Amino acid sequence: MLELSYPVLALDADIKMMAWGGDYDVIFSKLQSWGYKKVELLIRNSDTVQVDLLTEKLQEYNLGLSQIATGPMQRMDHIFLMSPDSLVRQTAVKQLYGLIELGSKFAGVR
């Protein structure tokens, strides 16, 4: 069965995107009431995601995490794997490893 997912900005991603940013309680309670089952987390930096808070709020509102996306990282810090700058690519690879580790922390969340 198809489950609805909605993009939500991590707390450190203060940028205008096609995603909902702000207080997790406000966002997650609305998404839950509208029938959403999961959120897509848009992050700026894998090291600054408040894992305990996010896990607690996802569980409180019975929501899962469908994916982790890097739009804010690319738009705010210009970090991406295809950069012509080798230093930027190295930073992107470091962040990619952080994303994998971050994703593993949510394996048991709904």
Features from the language model and the residues they span:
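N-terminal pre-domain/capping segments
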Residues: 1-108
